[in-house]
């Protein structure tokens, strides 16, 4: 079961529906370009990045900001374990590395530690996954700026995430940002259309010895909003349950749990979960114009604009041709309706 494997893909043969994006990303990386992959969760950013790295055959390390939101610590530990980078044992100090990597280190020595390790790393791609959850944006940008200026010819970053938290400061650095003026290429990864989604479901079900007709495929695509991660999860469940309706029910149940965790993460970031939730509750009832949301929420123009911007960057809402905002993810809408 390859297409319906729920882990991020690393073999380009099983990266469905992203051929153009893969070729573009590979071309950028060959040029040593630093890349930012933007898009909502479950869109396939990690798989795209890993497959591009595989295609090139470069060595790589991965930092998952969901597991550790301290960028310095994660980068140093990943480099320490990178094969051929710097061969030391945990809890042992090495010459010219004035810090014990098994415990805390101080900021003054971090640049020296990185310098020693990066010099030994060789040609390397660093994948920073879901970077919006990293803390201390300025410190992250300082380290990225240092690596960019010093090791651009050998160290390349691929950074994935949605446009919240530290990602916003990386994508749109202000004039006072350490990253200001550095050339970093942005790629936005979009949802699949119906034809691609149904084609994926048909190919995946054929692989596991099951069938999928267009009508059922279209229903699943609409319920799961063309997000590859949700469609893959459906396929995984379908391969085990054998019943498409039961598999869809189970997938939606699991997807709502993921949304719940995302909402908690938004709260942990301190970017206004209560007000964001209030906006989503209104939009879960019906699409609304900005002026209608002003009336229903009672927020000031500036406050509403700020939170609308956050929701758009998260990929949670969008504006339609009637200039009305609506929740773009049906899973999110269902979750909001069930958790008023």
Predicted segments with their positions:
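Short, Lys/Arg-enriched N-terminal segment that forms or immediately precedes the first helix
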Residues: 7-10, 253-269
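Amphipathic alpha-helical "lid/sensor" segments that cap RecA-like P-loop NTPase cores
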Residues: 203-261
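C-terminal leucine-rich, beta-strand-based interaction scaffolds used for sensing/assembly
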Residues: 266, 272-340
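P-loop NTPase nucleotide-binding core
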Residues: 31-125, 131-134
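Sensor-1/coupling segment of RecA-like P-loop NTPase cores
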Residues: 133-134, 146-176
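Alpha-helical DNA-recognition elements
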Residues: 55, 237, 310-314
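Helix-loop-helix "sensor" segment of P-loop NTPases
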Residues: 170-222
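A short, basic N-terminal segment
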Residues: 1-35, 40, 165, 331-340
